[in-house]
A protein has these predicted regions:
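Short secondary-structure boundary micro-motifs
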Residues: 2, 30-33, 78-81
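Sec-dependent N-terminal signal peptides
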Residues: 4-15
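Non-cytosolic coordination micro-motifs
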Residues: 20-73, 108-197
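Residues at beta-strand starts and edge strands
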Residues: 6, 91, 104-107, 177-181
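Mid-chain, structured segments of secreted extracytoplasmic proteins
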Residues: 74-119
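Positively charged n-region of N-terminal signal peptides that target proteins for export
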Residues: 1-4, 20
Length: 197
């Protein structure tokens, strides 16, 4: 019995040593922590990496979805309607760009559903969130000024927490073709152009 007790203590001390080593890996900068952050980082949408140039993004999106429905003349936005991504058929998709005078950077992507009722918008928001939540393990839940729940999750591709993406419902100030709400996932905007003195 004494040998069994000593063997049990030995096993516990070995496991305790492994647990201690493992917990060090979860500290900021540790191996497990870095792997976890990498999985939480929003790196791309629809096959286009955030930070890609307008020209690169346009070519990738044209190969995937065909000609855009709308190209802004200043080349800051590309819009598609009724396209699928991640198994979801969105009524609207936009890819937005930031410019520094010499270069362009894809810094935002919005995908969503135009909805006629608040209930429809909540259902679409929940469907988007269920899909996104399966990949991102940390999030915050809030309620906006219109009483709609919204979720924030993910990490910016520029580093740091927060501002990865938001899943929410936007109540339109004026109905648009009978639609009063927009349920969306919005990645960014990420600030690629740093202008400091």
């Amino acid at each position: 019995m004494k040998k069994l007790f000593i063997l049990g203590l030995l096993c516990l001390s070995v496991l305790g040593g492994y647990a201690q080593d493992d917990s060090d890996d979860w500290k900021v900068g540790g191996k497990h922590y870095q792997e976890w952050v990498a999985k939480q980082t929003c790196t791309e949408a629809c096959g286009v990496r955030f930070g890609s140039s307008y020209e690169t993004a346009k070519e990738i999106l044209k190969r995937k979805y065909g000609e855009p429905d709308y190209l802004e003349t200043n080349e800051n936005i590309i819009v598609y309607h009724y396209k699928s991504y991640g198994g979801m058929n969105f009524t609207y998709m936009s890819f937005n760009f930031q410019r520094d005078g010499a270069h362009s950077y894809m810094n935002q992507c919005v995908m969503g559903y135009e909805c006629k009722t608040a209930e429809e918008a909540k259902d679409k928001r929940d469907a988007i969130w269920t899909k996104a939540r399966s990949k991102y393990t940390a999030w915050s839940e809030y309620v906006d000024e219109n009483g709609f729940k919204y979720y924030e999750s993910g990490c910016s591709p520029l580093g740091g927490f927060g501002n990865g993406f938001i899943v929410d419902v936007v109540k339109l100030s004026e109905p648009y073709n009978g639609y009063r709400y927009f349920a969306r996932i919005m990645y960014g905007p990420y600030n690629y152009v740093q202008e400091d003195f």
